UniProtKB/Swiss-Prot annotation:
Residues 19-43 are annotated as: Disordered. It catalyses: ATP + H2O = ADP + phosphate + H(+). PANTHER family: ATP-DEPENDENT RNA HELICASE DBP3. Its EC number is 3.6.4.13. It comes from Aspergillus fumigatus (strain ATCC MYA-4609 / CBS 101355 / FGSC A1100 / Af293) (Neosartorya fumigata). A motif (DECD box) lies at residues 211-214. Residues 19-29 have a biased composition (Low complexity). This is ATP-dependent RNA helicase sub2.
Amino acid sequence: MSHEEDLIDYSDEELQTTDAAATTAAPAANGAQDKKGDLTVSGGRPDKKGSYVGIHSTGFRDFLLKGELLRAITDCGFEHPSEVQQVCIPTAILNVDVLCQAKSGLGKTAVFVLTTLHQLEPVPGECSVLVMCHTRELAYQIKNEYARFSKYLPDVKTAVFYGGTPIQKDIEVLSNKESYPNIVVGTPGRLNALVREKKLSLRNVKAFVLDECDKMLDQIGKQAQIAHMRRDVQEIFRATPADKQVMMFSATLSQEIRPICKKFMRNPLEVYVDDDTKLTLHGLQQYYIKLSESEKNRKLNELLDSLEFNQVIIFVKSTLRANELDKLLRECNFPSIAVHSGVSQEERIKRYKEFKEFNKRICVATDVFGRGIDIERINLAINYDLPADADSYLHRVGRAGRFGTKGLSISFVSSEEDEKVLKEIEKRFEVALPEYPEGGVDSSTYMA
């Protein structure tokens, strides 16, 4: 079987999904429950002595992390951990499994990056940490987070593997003991291909992490590519030792997906947002505009001309629409780029870096950028095409207003289907989205 037959392109979320299961926090069958602000916390392995729920830290030093990690954290300018970091890290560093749902932009990635780096004792030629996510861009971003926090840990080697690039390059990295990574980040299709070919050994894995876990494990009512992804995750999981730490994270975890996640775990610490309304993003102003399909381009042009913003991400539902809209914007002298699965992997990473490094201020994207991508200067998100469900909406608009900062989102509503989704969003999050005011919005209310 060729390598390419194993590589399914999961990274574009353009096929519209139809279900958006309600997400409400339920206490675990085992363990007490503790409310901390927006979070519901429960569980933790019973074989561990004491209770770690409710540990509150005012600074990262209180976590007793390695000195090298604290230096890197200081270099990044971080002073105080977010609430999800306060709740998760003290328990996670004790090797307890973690299932965490927290809204976008609150530092979930740092939970597993800092935890695994703190626990890691690198052995040359051995992979100890395996992190999987559903898109190549997110994998690339996570790898960069590991690089950022391991800058004072010179013996730690990290590599990222995903489809769309020659697999031979990955094999070369894994064939050299000097470059063999202690931490592997990647997408399930490519990782499973490397495991099947016996190029990547997982027999020494001590930490198994899924970021945006619901996207990889939920196959009920979803497109076939999600089912393939779940199959790959299961095969990879079986290739790892039974005794390991498992951590899973997402901004949305429905009641249906939680039991599936927990099948991979042993008595995990469970951290959930109290209820769906808490999933809305504080500091992010959200509006909609009713208009016809033919009016979208003119209205978008008006918004980009009139609104102040640092960077804007514009979501569309297909690669074709992304290309056409990007072309139109550039013809109107807007500094735009497009990111979607139709672009080669090398070019996608190049464009991602251009946008991340503020060389471009406008990005037209499909849902490939809808989850997990953290670009701190984005403070405006526009749904040129409304997504198919409330969960996708939350992930999209969460690109603006990261880590509790201010932001603005505007959604175009142009069809009966859009109106149904809008009502679903309002019902799900118990919020009435206002119509965008004719006079516009005061920039001081969403510009940091």
